[in-house]
Amino acid sequence: MNISIITQYSFIVVAIGTMLLAMATGIVGTISILKGQSLIGDAVGHASLPGIILAFMISGRKSSLILIFGAIVAGIVAFILIQIIAEGSKIEADTAMAVILSAMFGMGMVLKSYIQGNPKYQGASQSGLASYIFGQAAYILREDVYIILAVSVISLALFIVFYKEIKVYVFDMVYAYTIGINSRLTSLLIMIITMILIAAGLKAVGAILISSMLITPAVTGLQWSKSYKKVLMIAAVTGAVSAFLGTFISSAVKGFSTGPSIILIMSVIALFSVLFAPRGIVRMLLNIRKMRVGK
């Protein structure tokens, strides 16, 4: 394994992009976990695919900004449809998410197949569009890193500025209402942050795995502490470390994709935490055993 890879420009560009993204998504993902909305990242990620393909079909270009804009628009449409179904029928929100993500991802795959076989789009370069499905950070360019940097900074800035409102909204909606916090606006803010992070991360991780980047670091953080601030710090560090190691492994070992490598490392850390962390399964079983012995 060639350690000198970490000094190469291409590695540094990809590593910076994935680490920034993983830190931001790890922090924001704690909200989805604590609010019981773990599927929302999956729904928005899958639903963004038709937006990306349609943006390419309309513009005829693979500009990252154009494709990200298409992903955000599709994510907004998916969110609105989920809300309409959940509030206007007896269908649960999780079920509505599953229906919408499946339908829109299927639409995206149909559109992708359509442009591949259509002479109208033969002149436009379609290479690299598949990276938005499965993720391939090797395609990340300096422009993409700048976009990820901007999105991550904006997302974290919004999170910090509205930290008090978000924290109260997450843990006690009744109290949030009594002190005048607008729950709808707070929910909308959280959704906007989540959507732009997902859209920015699709090229690196892919629509299929992007939700794992939101959820897995948050799961890890929640196993190690009850303090929300500490959970946020652990989630951010877990995301950054996993992104760096995943990028390094995929660069050093031929045939390893960056996105799946990052998610695999995140999952290993999360599994270890679920088993052995202070709030993990092993500690819980030991505490139960002590209580039984004490009786």
Q: Which stretches of residues belong to each language-model region?
A:
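Short loop segments and helix-boundary regions at transmembrane helix junctions
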Residues: 30-45, 49-122, 222-234, 252-255
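Transmembrane alpha-helical segments in multi-pass inner-membrane proteins
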Residues: 203-258
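Small-residue-rich segments of transmembrane alpha-helices in multi-pass membrane proteins
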Residues: 47-55, 99-110, 183-188, 192-193, ...
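Hydrophobic alpha-helical transmembrane segments
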Residues: 15-20, 68-73, 98-99, 145-150, ...
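Helix-loop-helix "hairpin" substructures at the membrane interface of multi-pass membrane proteins
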Residues: 141-217
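Cytosolic-side transmembrane-helix boundaries in multi-pass membrane proteins
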Residues: 256-295
